[in-house]
Amino acid sequence: MVYDEIDPFSDMLVEVSGTVPFIKLEYPDISGDPFLMENVKYEAAKTDGLSNGDVVTITATASKTALKAAKKVFSRTTMQYTVEGQPFYLTPDTVLNDEQMAALRSCMDTLVEAAFLNGGEDVQHGAQGYLYGDAWKYWGSEPTATLVSCDNLEAVVFPASGGDPGYVEFLANATVTFCANQGNAQPETFSACMCITSKYIEMQGNDITFWEVSHVSFAENQEKAVLSLRKKDPTCKEIPLPAAE
């Protein structure tokens, strides 16, 4: 009996969707061959929680009876698919190359610059809270916050959990001049750890494709800020950022 050798993966379309570590692998279109569609079962060793670089083995199986009746034999029963080029969330497990580190530094520079636009609109609430606590009587109708200096930049990265991609705290030693009420209060210059919370950082290749500032606050110093963050989650990771080019 002559058997027709067929490749069960010849027309397989593999689709990868999502963002690492929430990648999902599917193979919605197998083949137009009626035999393959009706008799072959495909199973991937892993379909969820994939990362770039993961190699997934997909296995094709069919009953001996079906193969014999159709006079067919498989040329292979497994294929390997490599996940690559997918966007990823920055997590404590992410290993960054020099270009990605530079992109992260550039992102923080942008966040700091944006925070002090419009009289430091995004910083005003955090500055007043740091200086005066709940003494809202110091708050005026035209507050301003101006950045004097900023150095020792770092990111503290929190892990993904469930469907939450985690978040990032950008920290820096900052000197800021704050005036609670123009014309009725003297400007105050203070030095503290500025904390810029980003909901998450999404990257693809060497580029940052998404970030979003949640809020800006201040702590007494960077060491205490990190200790406070580690109390929230001991698995968070500090990433010192390179000097600006």
Can you say where each PLM-predicted feature lies in the sequence?
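Viral structural modules
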Residues: 110-117, 121, 184-186, 209-212, ...
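Short Lys/Arg-enriched alpha/beta "domain-start" segment
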Residues: 103-147, 158
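Exposed beta-strand-loop-beta-strand "reactive/processing" segments of non-cytosolic proteins
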Residues: 48-61, 147-187
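A short, surface-exposed beta-strand/turn
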Residues: 69-88, 180-219
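Extracellular/mature segments of secreted proteins
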Residues: 115, 201-205, 243-245
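C-terminal partner/receptor-binding element of secreted or periplasmic proteins
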Residues: 218-245
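Membrane-lipid interaction segments
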Residues: 36-38, 42-44, 135-154
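Beta-rich interaction/scaffold domains
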Residues: 1-115, 180
